[in-house]
């Protein structure tokens, strides 16, 4: 996979994308990430990338020209090795980024993230993009932090990056539910003991316990996720039992 990032602050990405799983993914050849400072594509001597909006208003807007020229350069560089792929604009008004979105992007061969700054974008920039994405209902100083999060979450699902694909697929949200509690050695730490079922060696009992705890945690912390979760018949029965445990007067 090739990932291009357009940013006015390329140095921000050095500490995050060069470390841990994303860094290893690049070292192992699973992902090629390039960060481009689109200020390099300005045409005026002062290297301006922003200007006041027509019609007046507060703040400054990113100009279309540097972004378009930077995208043209990326297309020329990659046209013989990668398809154009999806272009994701960082925008608070965009689609909420989640695990499903990350898994979706991981299927692509080429992704380009455009990081904004200032008040917003010249609307014509949107002609370049296939997706607009947001981390949530709040505004950041720039799109760099959002792009880092999205790249990290996406790279985890690129085939080969995590040797055991059951690992990312077991993460919270991958199956629509929160992840079950996990423990490691020692089995007894300061009086806090690991549930006996996890040390029993009974794999079926462990599977059932994990399923129940995942549903319980989701019900307690993020009940909204259950509205769209695709539950098996077994999960539905367990969930009904959990609801009765929490509220014995709830309808059966």
From Swiss-Prot:
**Subcellular location(s) per record:** Cytoplasm
Q: Which NCBIfam families match?
A: PRK00026.1, trmD
Say if the entry is tagged with keyword tRNA processing.
yes
Q: Name the chain's protein.
A: tRNA (guanine-N(1)-)-methyltransferase
Similarity section: Belongs to the RNA methyltransferase TrmD family.
Q: Which GO terms describe its cellular component?
A: cytosol
GO molecular function terms noted in the UniProt entry: tRNA (guanine(37)-N1)-methyltransferase activity
Species this protein is from: Limosilactobacillus fermentum (strain NBRC 3956 / LMG 18251) (Lactobacillus fermentum)
